[in-house]
Each structure stands twice: as C-alpha cells, then as structure tokens.
Amino acid sequence: MDFKKSNSRLITTFIEKLKWRLKMLGDKAGSMTLQETSKPIDSGQYGLPAMETSTVGGGKLLGHDVQTQATFTAHMRPDGSWLGHAHAGVIFCAEGVATYKCDGVGNMMETGGVSFRGGAIFETTSEALSELNGKYYMFTYESDPEGKAEWHLYPCN
C-alpha cells in the first residue's frame, strides 16, 4: 500500500468535509460583551447543582449598536457538563427590539469561567433587525471567573 497516496486521499477528504461544514455557518452576525450575575437555584436533580444567571451588556449585531439583557438557567448533568436555557432575552437598539431564546451545552474551564456552545432563535418586527427572523444562529459564549462574558453569533446557512 502506498501510504503517501493514502494519506493524501485522507487529507483531501478531510479538507472537503471541512469546507462543507464551514459553508454551513455564515459570517459573524455580531458580538456582545456581557456582565453575568449568578445565583444557585434548586435543580431538583438528585443533588446536582443548577444556576440562574442574568446577563446585561452590549455590542454589535448586524452592524447596529445593541444592548441586551437575558436570564439563563443551567443545570449540571451527571457527566459534569452543563445544559443551559435562556427562555427570555431581549436586544435593544435605536432601530427597534428583538427577543430571543437560546439553548447550549457548556463546561467549567480551569480558569474558573465557563464555555458554552449552542443555538439561538430571534423574533423582531424591526425592519433593521429583520434579518434575524427565520434563521437559526450558532453561538460561542465564554466567561471569566469575574463574570465578564463574550457572546458571538453566526447564522446557519
């Protein structure tokens, strides 16, 4: 067997699959810097912890200066990861408002912060933010031990 040829085929296949996956996500729709405030809540899950986290902050979304507020709940799962839900988030900008819901899975980082990946859906009647409607957005969410967080959004194509 020609290992050089075999490896070349594997690398080519990997690159083609990677290109396909990258096409699934569009260009970054926005980024926001947030401040978290968290408190423990009853999880009802056999002694595993749960947290309620409120966030407030701002940044850019679809080229607009925005402010956002949301409340998330996250429940620790038996494997130590966290399952998070935001049932009510709001985006404010001079051109209108939008609401959103998110779900994500995350883990504690060695630094003491958290790292989540997930998806969000938005609804708005604002023409300026109307591009949010009817799309699913993937997100990355990272926070530090002091509760300073970064939220980055990417539309799924």
Task: Cite the ranges covered by each PLM segment.
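Beta-strand-enriched cores of mature, soluble protein domains
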Residues: I11-N157
